[in-house]
């Protein structure tokens, strides 16, 4: 196999869960896209990437059971995450931490406002979320947001130093900076439940939780690797971490990721079957619906041009990825996004 191409693992084969889409997708997606575009945050190129990425379609797959209002809220959140992610990818460690602080403070403190677009967008999302979210769910969501922003800053610092972590250090970082855990927290919001903190201390519950999270993170990394290497952003990717740590080539690494993703799914199914009924039906319901992230994310990755460009449907069939050349970077208007009115 040429080093200029590789074959993706067949993650659909290893994930027996059934995919579905949300009937409210078109309306919720259009409203959310208009909302975020109304702030004129993106350069022309970034706006095109935003539209092509179809973040709202991801929500339709992974939250297929959500009501109309709840789906709109999840679409707003993944679009907000796109803004934070795209801004921080263009920044050094200091800049990414400043962006993260704006995001976190606007999320946590209702009366805090630095006048920036990011703060305004974040506060508008939070007003929608807290209207229906329970108090424990809200607190966990904000705590996860703090961890997410810290890890996004750490990712930028690692990128600035051209430093690759070892696998043991990368996994906890990726669990947080991927925002998957924040997206899992939205499951409680959608279902209208507010799990006790003790549920998140249960061994089998957390084993299923982490297995689902890792499957989503590793799958996303193998699918996004070509796009990220073309942008010079592959340092925060399990593919680069494993090749560096294990001395394997790209194809060997892709094959290994496929094996591990299959194991994550098996671990999730096994742990879910062992969750004690004493945790209550809502705990099992939550874990059930978290699982749809594993299959929904896979389907979405092939359904849009975000990772594979115009050949995304062909690549779903052949699984052959031809590596793209490095891009000439064009920034997103990050200064406008985080600059306050007072400056």
Curated annotation (Swiss-Prot):
Mg(2+) 3 binds at residues 220, 224, 228. Signal peptide: none annotated. It is an enzyme of class 4 (lyase). Its cofactor is Mg(2+). Optimum temperature is 29 degrees Celsius. GO terms for biological process: isoprenoid biosynthetic process. Its EC number is 4.2.3.-, 4.2.3.127, 4.2.3.128, 4.2.3.129. Optimum pH is 7.0. It comes from the Eukaryota. The record marks 82 as: Plays a critical role in the stabilization of intermediate cation. Mg(2+) 1 binds at residue 85. It catalyses: (2E,6E)-farnesyl diphosphate + H2O = cubebol + diphosphate; (2E,6E)-farnesyl diphosphate = beta-copaene + diphosphate; (2E,6E)-farnesyl diphosphate = delta-cadinene + diphosphate; (2E,6E)-farnesyl diphosphate = germacrene D + diphosphate. A motif (DDXXD motif) lies at residues 85-89. Disulfide bonds: none annotated. Mg(2+) 2 binds at residue 85. A motif (NSE/DTE motif) lies at residues 220-228. Keywords: Lyase, Magnesium, Metal-binding. InterPro entries: Isoprenoid_synthase_dom_sf (IPR008949), Terpene_cyclase-like_2 (IPR034686). Terpene cyclase that catalyzes the cyclization of farnesyl diphosphate (FPP) to various sesquiterpenes, including cubebol as the major product and beta-copaene, delta-cadinene, germacrene D, germacrene D-4-ol, sativene, tau-muurolol, beta-cubebene and beta-elemene as minor compounds, along with minute amounts of further sesquiterpenoids. The conserved DDXXD and NSE/DTE motifs are important for the catalytic activity, presumably through binding to Mg(2+). This is Cubebol synthase cubA. It comes from Psilocybe cubensis.
């Amino acid at each position: 196999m040429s080093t200029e191409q590789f074959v993706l693992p067949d993650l659909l084969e290893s994930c027996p869960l059934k995919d579905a889409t949300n009937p409210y997708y078109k309306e919720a997606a259009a409203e959310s896209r208009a909302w975020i575009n109304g702030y004129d945050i993106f350069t022309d190129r970034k706006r095109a990437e935003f539209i092509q990425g179809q973040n709202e379609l991801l929500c339709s797959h992974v939250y297929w059971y959500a009501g109309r209002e709840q789906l709109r809220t999840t679409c707003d959140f993944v679009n907000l995450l796109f803004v934070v992610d795209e801004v921080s990818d263009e920044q050094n460690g200091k800049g990414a931490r400043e962006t993260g602080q704006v995001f976190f403070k606007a999320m946590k403190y209702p009366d805090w406002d630095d006048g920036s677009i990011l703060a305004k967008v974040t506060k508008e999302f939070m007003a929608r979320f807290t209207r229906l979210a329970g108090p424990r769910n809200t607190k966990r969501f904000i705590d996860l947001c703090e961890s997410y922003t810290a890890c996004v800053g750490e990712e930028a610092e690692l990128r600035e130093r051209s430093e690759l972590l070892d696998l043991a250090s990368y996994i906890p970082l990726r669990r947080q900076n991927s925002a998957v855990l924040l997206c899992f927290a939205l499951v409680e919001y959608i279902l209208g439940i507010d799990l006790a903190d003790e549920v998140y201390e249960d061994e089998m519950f957390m084993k299923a939780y982490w297995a689902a999270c890792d499957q989503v993170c590793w799958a996303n990394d193998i699918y996004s690797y070509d796009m990220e290497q073309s942008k010079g952003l592959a340092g925060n990717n399990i593919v680069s971490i494993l090749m560096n740590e294990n001395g394997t080539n790209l194809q060997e690494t892709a094959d290994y990721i496929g094996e591990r993703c299959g194991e994550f799914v098996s671990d999730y199914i096994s742990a879910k079957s062992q969750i004690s009924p004493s945790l209550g039906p809502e705990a099992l319901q939550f874990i059930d619906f978290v699982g749809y992230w594993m299959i929904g994310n896979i389907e979405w990755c092939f359904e849009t041009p975000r990772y594979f460009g115009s050949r995304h449907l062909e690549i779903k069939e052949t699984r052959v990825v031809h590596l793209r050349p490095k891009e000439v970077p064009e920034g997103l208007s990050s200064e406008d996004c985080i600059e306050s009115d007072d400056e």
